[in-house]
């Protein structure tokens, strides 16, 4: 037994040798002692070993594409085409990482010489249709670091704005600066259509926030060892850098691509679609539905450079949400907006309900504003602002009903008083 002093009244840790007065807690075992600091150190070592053994993609039991799609169905309404494409692309990406982790590089070279490449994803579609939410939900299911960046803030190196390496800094921050975890994460770059080349023909003037950003993104999309400044901002020679390999980072880029449907429709013209169509018949594809028929040449004409398009082999489209889909978004997902507000009112001991007419009116307003699902919360917040101000101070309200008239502005929410037990611990009559 480790003791200090002649009287033997002071004990010390058997691992670090600190006395019981130097540590917060000393735990006794059969003939040994361990302090709280050594216990914390042991926990960190165990966590590091577990995380290093999990390098095969963040998920030991990788869900199949159908399982991934079913998970997305529980959180995201509609967009079946995008969900299927995303599920297949993500499954293949992490399956490739797992296979490379399980087979040494030397053995891979001795086998058939086939090296699996990375397939980044391009998502097209108007705002508020679920592009960002799909990527976030997929990352949450796989338990991998997720970072989101805005392409409009990026500029070519050497100009005012953010370097593309700052995207990887956000990924490192999401992984708590665990480089190994960050190297298997997912990055979503929004507003990628805003960095399209300003003109189809190359210009003699430098396009630092358009084509210049596309050029800067090429290497990290394909896979390179990037030097990331840990404090962010611009690089300078005296700064320390964190090296991160982007070979196994999955990049999902998205944008509204307003005007791309016109380019597609012009290319398609009035030619009949399909193999069995009557040669004399014609069908014109217009509007956002045309995005599903996009080809690389359409993206090039829009303003993306060929090298950038080539690094985004998986292309899918999300479509505008109609009234029916918006009503479903309000009630069906696990994290539905109505459930969120019901939970918020429940914390004050008040029951909140929405009538069918109210749900339809919220959807109609969102369609009229053209904000998609992103505008639903703003509409509910506007309607409930006065209610959320009054109700916490009133003991005579136990139920609030949101009606169609309250949404349209022709009336107000109904306050009801029924004997419902409050979370505050009292009854209201």
Swiss-Prot record:
Q: Which GO terms describe its cellular component?
A: HslUV protease complex
Keyword match Nucleotide-binding: yes
BP GO terms, sorted: cell division; proteolysis involved in protein catabolic process
Classify the source by domain of life: Bacteria
Q: Where does this protein hold Zn(2+)?
A: 13, 16, 35, 38
According to the entry, every stretch annotated as the ClpX-type ZB domain falls at: 1-54
Keywords assigned: ATP-binding, Chaperone, Metal-binding, Nucleotide-binding, Zinc
GO molecular function annotations of the record = ATP binding; ATP hydrolysis activity; ATP-dependent protein folding chaperone; protein dimerization activity; unfolded protein binding; zinc ion binding
Kindly list the positions annotated as binding ATP. 126-133
Xref: Pfam families: AAA_2, ClpB_D2-small, zf-C4_ClpX
User: What quaternary arrangement does the UniProt entry report?
Assistant: Component of the ClpX-ClpP complex. Forms a hexameric ring that, in the presence of ATP, binds to fourteen ClpP subunits assembled into a disk-like structure with a central cavity, resembling the structure of eukaryotic proteasomes.
Sequence similarity: Belongs to the ClpX chaperone family.
Question: What task does this protein carry out?
Answer: ATP-dependent specificity component of the Clp protease. It directs the protease to specific substrates. Can perform chaperone functions in the absence of ClpP.
**The protein, known as:** ATP-dependent Clp protease ATP-binding subunit ClpX
This protein's species is Cutibacterium acnes (strain DSM 16379 / KPA171202) (Propionibacterium acnes)
